[in-house]
Amino acid sequence: MSSYKYYDLIRKPIITEKTTTLSEQNKYAFYVDKFAKKLTLKKAIEEIFKVKVKKVNILNVKGKKKRFKGIIGTQINRKKAIVTLEKDHNIDFAGGIK
């Protein structure tokens, strides 16, 4: 699979208080494409970030029901991937920020 398709699999990293505490354990969270599989995500993370992936956990997040101007709607369903890296590897999301 070419590298540009790997960039389509990973939507965006999840940067919250909970995921920053997970990064201390070498675990990083991403929103990914809803058709992504564990093996292709592992290859994509390894090629894009040049790290060694130990394990990938995937979970589907159901969209919440929200109200807007009296009309009830739902947010989109998402797929979340929690990636565990090998011991000496890490991903720096804020590398160029000073």
From Swiss-Prot:
Record carries keyword Cytoplasm: no
InterPro entries associated with the record: Nucleotide-bd_a/b_plait_sf, Ribosomal_uL23-like, Ribosomal_uL23/eL15/eS24_sf
Listed SUPFAM superfamilies: Ribosomal proteins S24e, L23 and L15e
Keywords: Ribonucleoprotein, Ribosomal protein, RNA-binding, rRNA-binding
Superkingdom assignment: Bacteria
Keyword Ribonucleoprotein in record: yes
GO biological process: translation
Any one Gene Ontology cellular component term annotated for this protein: ribosome
One Pfam family here: Ribosomal_L23
Molecular-function GO term, any one: rRNA binding
Role of this protein: One of the early assembly proteins it binds 23S rRNA. One of the proteins that surrounds the polypeptide exit tunnel on the outside of the ribosome. Forms the main docking site for trigger factor binding to the ribosome.
Family membership noted in the UniProt record: Belongs to the universal ribosomal protein uL23 family.
Subunit composition and interactions: Part of the 50S ribosomal subunit. Contacts protein L29, and trigger factor when it is bound to the ribosome.
Name of the protein: Large ribosomal subunit protein uL23
Gene name in the database record: rplW
